Amino acid sequence: MDDTGAAPVVIFGGRSQIGGELARRLAAGATMVLAARNADQLADQAAALRAAGAIAVHTREFDADDLAAHGPLVASLVAEHGPIGTAVLAFGILGDQARAETDAAHAVAIVHTDYVAQVSLLTHLAAAMRTAGRGSLVVFSSVAGIRVRRANYVYGSAKAGLDGFASGLADALHGTGVRLLIARPGFVIGRMTEGMTPAPLSVTPERVAAATARALVNGKRVVWIPWALRPMFVALRLLPRFVWRRMPR
């Protein structure tokens, strides 16, 4: 079922490039909610969604790392706008791998935002959608989590955990009327990777959003972006470890 026109679409991480691009593609005829820190500064993002055809755009304060606020936020969104049709988890951080290797607090901060906070919010959202008997969840994993590399193992391990959790949650939701889409993009050329040398098969936020929107409409469970990464990682998983540990980012 495509709920995007029938119930609110909520973008958690409404200031992210991928989240913003995906929101524009889901906006036509929909009630949109952008949730992010400093929500009073989302005027430009809200205007873009109105221009894309949203019938209403709301903003909500959201700090992904404030786990205690997740449940009340989801409950208040349902109370104000009705059952959530589509929830997109577009927040996350890359962090500094070199720093994280010696700074435990920084390593934990990366894992907290990219895994723990996602698990918390997904659990609250899944419970609310189960109650409603419908809804769609969109989770952004990464190929960095398919086989974790030495070059970015802190971020990669968080994404590996998220991918596993989301896969299990999708199975748990089977038959409930709630579906979950896992997007697995490769290197994304954007603000978060500014200054870094793009990896092979890199993509833009626009391309990630377009592929994710198509997969959502078509009822897919997983989408690799670009698709060629899927067979590539089938092969990469077979590389001996002594070769794999020398792989660049």
UniProtKB/Swiss-Prot annotation:
Cross-referenced PROSITE patterns: ADH_SHORT
Any Pfam family hit: adh_short
Superkingdom, taxonomy of origin: Bacteria
Positions annotated as active site in the UniProt record: Y155
Binding site residues for substrate: S142
Alphabetical keyword list: Oxidoreductase
Protein known as: Uncharacterized oxidoreductase Rv2073c
